């Protein structure tokens, strides 16, 4: 047990320690300063030349968003075409068939919005070609899209008064070539050393310990797993994600993959401080996020290592903790750490089944996604926190009788309205979606039965499974309580639309706020200025997040996870 706890502590320390220098490097990349990765410039110039892009051309916030949305729309069409025709394409040694239109729609939307809501199993639902040229490609593009959006916001808040927020295409390419690609190569090399397969052969026939013949899927897993983690996408190469012994073979590979989930989201907070020369602000934001993260880790590690009281009643020893749905080679503590790490970000990968975690652990996993501001996805995580900063600034200003300001710019009704819509959209789509699915389940059983039935676990846990699915979609996370039968018309289309709304409306709103504030006249700090880089304001922001985001979900948790906890 002590060894497992030490492993958890070591991983967290490594994340924090390495995020700081990486954040400094990221800020230099976006500022165009000299870095060790300047050898990539010829490749970047070639990309810009082939695509007809002038990387030095500045964009206003509307042009920036237009480029972002056009890029995503193009790749959505690309993905749809490839997924429904994948059985005709090369690199399909196992003869896997095409995806149905509704499943392809869900898959494309999911990966286009940097989610990994997989209503299919990777071994049989995709080919090597679509794994590489749809899934892996999307994992680079969508991660770089979020990072580019944050780079634009960092540029806007760093300038005193400006009508432009940088060039989307330039930030997109730099995010890919200077940050995501180098880190992916390092992680991929480590995974290959640990035993993750990298090749294009078909299924391998092996003889099990029982003497039975079994076919084991392989393929280019080591190329895809690094970016799935670093880009906070989380889409597993294999159906059971990083629980699979070939996707995550050893405790070392588990540490590296878990580290990869959080390193860039953490670094982006520090990058904000270095880019804007406001390190104290970055430290305050990082402190709030880290506090929430550590609280979640503590609760889940405690819950999972103490085991299941129902099993205790049977007189069965649980020295390893609550091991249902967990890998013996990893243990309960490492699985609990991963469950929080993957849900405070938009990653969604798993190294154990969240459906099998203790009820309060499941509640913490959902609350992380329902709050959706602790580190979050690469780029967009801080942007969600930025929304609540605007709300907190406005409320704080009203409370003390000062004009609401953030970084020398007045926060007025227009920005506040946008921030409010973005903040309320998240609980709205989750709760309305869950209400619709539970209504259909209770009052239209024939429809549910026609889709094969949805729930394997009725009662409190059945509600949790439906709530988790919509929560995961809205947070662009993609993990799931897999007792839910979700590869149906209802879940594919309902989740697809939630994914679209929850990805693009917040990005549009957050970039719009940054663009509107950037155009305003800069007001120098004075004795009457509300300081946003203090512990007091950090606590205020945390309180606003807790009240607006967390409390919206406590009634439904009282009927699901909390009720299930007290029923044990």
Regions found by a protein language model. Name each.
Residues 1-106, 161-166, 170-207, 283, ...:
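N-terminal alpha-helical transmembrane segments of multi-pass membrane transport
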Residues 22, 395, 437-441, 506-519, ...:
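Membrane-helix cytosolic exit motif
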Residues 66-76, 138-148, 257-269, 381-395, ...:
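Hydrophobic alpha-helical transmembrane segments
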Residues 68-82, 174-197, 261-264, 273, ...:
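Selective recognition of specific alpha-helical transmembrane segments in multi-pass small-molecule
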Residues 90-134, 197-259, 312-380, 448-501, ...:
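P-loop potassium selectivity filter motif centered on the GYG triad
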Residues 126-200, 252-283:
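A conserved hydrophobic secondary-structure block that centers on an alpha-helix together
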Residues 270-276, 398-412, 512-533:
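Alpha-helical transmembrane segments
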Residues 387-391, 396, 400, 418-457, ...:
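C-terminal catalytic subdomain
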């Amino acid at each position: 047990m002590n060894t497992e706890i030490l492993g958890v502590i070591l991983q967290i320390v490594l994340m924090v320690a390495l995020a700081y220098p990486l954040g400094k490097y990221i800020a230099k990349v976006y500022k165009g300063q000299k870095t060790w990765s300047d050898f990539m410039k010829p490749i970047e110039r070639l990309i810009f030349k082939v695509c007809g892009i002038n990387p030095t051309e500045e964009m206003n916030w509307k042009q920036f968003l237009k480029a972002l949305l056009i890029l995503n729309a193009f790749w959505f069409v690309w993905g749809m075409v490839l997924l429904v025709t994948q059985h005709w394409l090369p690199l399909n040694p196992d003869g896997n068939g095409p995806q149905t239109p509704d499943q392809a729609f869900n898959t494309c939307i999911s990966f286009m919005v940097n989610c990994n809501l997989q209503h299919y199993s990777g071994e049989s639902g995709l080919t090597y070609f679509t794994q590489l040229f749809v899934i892996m490609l999307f994992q680079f593009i969508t991660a770089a899209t979020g990072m580019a959006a944050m780079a634009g916001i960092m540029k806007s808040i760093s300038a005193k008064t400006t009508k432009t927020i940088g060039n989307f295409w330039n930030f997109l390419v730099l995010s890919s070539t200077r940050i995501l690609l180098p880190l992916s190569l390092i992680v991929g090399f480590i995974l290959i050393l640990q035993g993750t397969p990298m090749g294009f052969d078909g299924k391998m026939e092996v003889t099990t310990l029982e003497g039975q013949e079994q076919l084991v899927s392989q393929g280019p897993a080591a190329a895809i797993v690094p970016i799935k983690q670093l880009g906070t996408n989380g889409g597993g190469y294999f159906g059971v994600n990083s629980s699979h012994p070939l996707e995550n073979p050893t405790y070392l590979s588990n540490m590296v993959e878990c580290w990869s989930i959080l390193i860039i989201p953490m670094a982006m907070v520090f990058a904000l401080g270095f880019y804007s020369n406001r390190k104290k602000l970055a430290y305050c934001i990082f402190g709030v996020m880290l506090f929430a993260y550590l609280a979640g880790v503590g609760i889940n590690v405690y819950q999972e290592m103490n085991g299941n009281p129902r099993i205790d009643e049977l007189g069965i020893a649980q020295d390893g903790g609550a091991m249902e749905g967990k890998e013996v080679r990893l243990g309960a503590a490492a699985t609990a750490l991963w469950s929080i790490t993957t849900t405070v970000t938009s990653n969604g990968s798993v190294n154990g089944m969240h459906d099998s975690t203790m009820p309060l652990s499941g509640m913490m996993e959902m609350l992380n996604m329902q709050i959706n501001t602790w580190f979050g996805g690469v780029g967009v995580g801080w942007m969600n926190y930025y929304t609540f900063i605007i709300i907190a600034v406005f409320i704080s200003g009203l409370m003390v009788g000062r004009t609401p300001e953030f970084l020398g710019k007045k926060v007025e009704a227009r920005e506040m309205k946008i921030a409010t819509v973005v903040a309320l959209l998240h609980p709205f789509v989750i709760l309305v979606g869950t209400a619709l699915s539970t209504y259909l389940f209770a009052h239209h059983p024939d429809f549910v039965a026609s889709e094969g039935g949805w729930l394997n676990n009725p009662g409190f846990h059945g509600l949790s499974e439906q709530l988790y699915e919509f929560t995961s979609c809205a947070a662009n996370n993609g993990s799931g309580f897999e007792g839910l039968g979700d590869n149906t018309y209802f879940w594919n289309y309902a989740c697809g639309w939630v994914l679209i709304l929850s990805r693009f409306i917040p990005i549009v709103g957050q970039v719009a706020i940054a663009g509107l504030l950037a155009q305003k006249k800069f007001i120098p700090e004075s004795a009457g200025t509300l300081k946003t880089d203090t512990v007091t304001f950090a606590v205020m922001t945390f309180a606003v997040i807790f009240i607006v985001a967390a409390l919206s979900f406590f009634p439904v948790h009282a009927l699901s996870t909390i009720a299930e906890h007290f029923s044990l």
